[in-house]
Structure formats: C-alpha cells, structure tokens
C-alpha cells in the first residue's frame, strides 16, 4: 500500500501555530484551501474529509506526516 507523505509546511495557515501531530489540508468555509491544525480545521471547515473537501495527515514515529486513508 502506497503511503502519501506531506511535503508542505507544518505551520497552520490560519493561527500560524506549528502543527505537532495532526495536520489537515482542507477547503475552508471561506473558499480557499489551507493547511490547518485540528482546532482551526474544526472552526473553519465543514468538518468532512474526502474528494473536494480535504485530507488528514498524522505524524508517524519518523516525524513525517502521512495521509490517513478514510
């Protein structure tokens, strides 16, 4: 099984905090997509993931964010 690794920034586009364990790459309720921490994802999205909505990445033991399959 191929695992998708996140190569983007680990800083939340909304609150600018460094993301430590769970990262979301998702569409916001305002239209544009953003890299978000869990709190900002909850506050600024429709809280759904999938095609056209967003993806969730979880940090593994090597320190890489890996896409979590739905």
Regions found by a protein language model. Name each.
Residues 21-25, 47-50:
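Short Cys/His-rich "knuckle" micro-motifs
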Residues 24-34:
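Short linker/helix segments within small regulatory modules
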Residues 3, 10-11:
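N-terminal first-folded block
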Residues 9-10, 17-22:
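Cys/His-rich Zn2+-binding "zinc-finger" mini-domains, especially FYVE domains
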Residues 38-68:
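Short metal-binding segments enriched for Cys and/or His
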Residues 6-7, 32:
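Flanking scaffold residues of small Cys/His-coordinated metal-binding clusters
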């Amino acid at each position: 099984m191929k695992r998708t690794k996140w190569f983007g920034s680990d800083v939340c586009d909304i609150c600018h905090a460094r993301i430590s364990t769970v990262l979301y790459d998702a569409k916001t309720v305002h239209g544009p997509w953003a890299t978000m921490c869990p709190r900002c994802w909850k506050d600024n999205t429709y809280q759904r993931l999938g095609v056209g909505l967003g993806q969730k990445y979880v940090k593994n033991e090597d320190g890489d964010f890996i896409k979590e399959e739905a």
